[in-house]
């Protein structure tokens, strides 16, 4: 991922130094287990820890000749360890190192993403509570529908990201497995106790059954989860973009002193963060299909999955980490305009209360189809600019509801009377 959309801690997970450090730990812990089993001398295992080291540049140099990254690493490691290096990697295959390392890296990435989600959830909850009773328009198909509150809008996104957090916890647990089982997963040349020891030291579970590789359905579920989270990011970003339209302007991104929106038009205040998040969501989702396609490999293994994972695993996790942090900051500083929300509520002259009128007529004994036609007749006149909705209804002889009851249909509070109950349902579920 390019530096522009990278944060240091997540990017560091995918740097060669971290990858080779994990490789070293896998090999060194495996030596400890082999020594405990009497397969290699204890002094050899100690030598690996004491003298073991690596240089990224040297590994790259060796790989240019060997065309094999794990062999290049082991060769460089042997240059430091010396004679005892012949006991390193006993009974193991390259995928034992590669796949176990990837499990560690994906676990590390998930931990950062979970922290990102916690910050975002805290921001959404705080802003939702702040605007719990701030009335605003609910829209369907982009058209005014009925009143809701801005707090409810944000609460819906909060609930989605809470579900996403639960999904990511499950995906992390599923992908965090260690496989050190030899050439085709049969443990023919290595004791399963070695796998158990390395898994414990690295904080992983053992892979119950592997081939030469850890089954890629685990990784597919992980990246599918990242794709869902990215779609939730885009969903909220898209809402903010729509609300910041000049014709709407119910909310907008914070515009910092000295910030500029256009090289040509000094007046512009553009939703650039939300637009950026929409784009980054596409980058993250781009990993989902390749991850699914990696599930099907030839027999006990081929390397068709390897090149793709080396690209999309860093890119997807780094991009999502950046996006979640940016979205949290956006929510924390989001500018909200209740006056504009109220003005938009009143813009259509009461049409947003049409369902209340429909229900009042049916309660008064009018058939639903007939009631719908009566209400729609007046509503279409309002759309055409031919009058006020309430006045037109009062003047309609087919509207049999008393004026006081009709006026009550236009009470905005009737639409939001269950807000407290909805908040309690969402937030109490969190506590339980």
PLM regions and their residue ranges:
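Short, well-ordered beta-strand elements within core beta-sheets of diverse protein domains
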Residues: 152, 220-228, 356-364
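A helix-coil-helix interface module used to build multimeric assemblies
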Residues: 1-187, 191-197, 206, 259-262, ...
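Short amphipathic alpha-helical segments with heptad-repeat character
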Residues: 107-118, 125, 155-158, 162, ...
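Generic, well-ordered alpha-helical scaffold segments in large soluble proteins
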Residues: 33, 76, 80, 123, ...
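Conserved hydrophobic residue
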Residues: 40, 45, 248-249, 367
